[in-house]
Every structure is written in C-alpha cells, then in structure tokens.
C-alpha cells in the first residue's frame, strides 16, 4: 500500500523487524498454578469474552500455546517495535480476587515492551532503548550512557543484555 511518504520505505518489512528484534521473555510463574500465568492468546479459550477466562483456563478447549502480539511504528529516523503479552490470570499463591488492589493477581493481564531502534547504515538499525510496562509501572533500559535519568523518566541503572545479537532479554 501507499504511505503517502515523500520517500518510499525501504529495508526490512515490519514483520522482519519484529522477528529480528523480538525479546526473549523470561517469565516466572507460581508453582501452585503454572498455567494461570502462561503467556497466551487473548482468545485462548475460543472466545473473546474476557470475564470467563478463569473458568475456562483448565477446560479441554483451552489452547495455552505461547503468543506475543506486536506492531511497528516507523518514522524517518527510528523504528518503535511494540510487543504485548497476555496472561489469562496474573497469578500468585496468595491470590484473593476480592482484593485486586491488595493482592498482585487479577484476570486478563496485558503487559509489554517496546524496543526503540535507530535507523542507520545497517540493515537492522541500532538499539537505542528498551521500555517495559507491567502493573502500570514503566521501566526504561539503555546501553548508551548518553541517555540519562534527566532526559528519561523511569530509567533503570541496568543495561540491556541480548541473546543472538539483537534479542533483548526481558
């Protein structure tokens, strides 16, 4: 399709970018109910009704295969690659669904990450920063010391490590 840009897009497709920079998810699950906190599709139970996810979690039709949603926003200078993961439950052993603000568990948990990549002379660009969001808390990670806490709120004093050159470890 046409983007009505002055310069026609070139380089990798958005799918290729999302695959090339896809983070490696390390996710802790509670050992009393592993499946409750799996990363899966929003419609893992065969419907898009969200208020029945706890009831449908252990039904035979539940497909708990791993799914990560993604999108790419492109400017003339950068790619912003967004990744989102869904959990039927955000689960802990001490979960009390009647106290959702006191206990860290709830139904329908969506969290995510954004990888910011600067376009350069290489095919895949250069990593700039990683932003993650979980439970309404933003964390920003970078490897360039020029990006400072004065310029970036929520900056963590931890660098980003990668698997296979371009895959940030979360």
Regions found by a protein language model. Name each.
Residues 3-113, 117-170:
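A domain-level signal for the mature, folded cores of soluble proteins
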């Amino acid at each position: 399709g046409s983007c009505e840009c002055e310069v026609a897009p070139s380089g990798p497709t958005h799918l290729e970018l999302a695959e090339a920079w896809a983070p490696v998810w390390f996710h802790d699950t509670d050992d009393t109910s592993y499946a409750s906190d799996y990363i899966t599709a929003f419609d893992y139970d065969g419907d898009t009704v969200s208020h029945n996810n706890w009831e449908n979690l252990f039904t035979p039709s539940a497909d708990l295969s791993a799914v990560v949603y993604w999108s790419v926003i492109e400017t003339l200078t950068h790619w912003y690659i967004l990744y989102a993961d869904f959990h039927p439950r955000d689960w802990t052993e001490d979960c009390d669904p009647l106290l959702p603000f006191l206990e860290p568990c709830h139904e329908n948990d969506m969290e995510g990450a954004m990888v910011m990549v600067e376009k350069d002379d290489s095919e895949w660009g250069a990593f700039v920063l990683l932003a993650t969001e979980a439970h309404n808390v933003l964390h920003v990670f970078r490897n360039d010391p020029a990006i400072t806490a004065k310029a970036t709120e929520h900056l963590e004093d931890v660098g980003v490590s990668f698997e296979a050159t371009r895959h940030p470890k979360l």
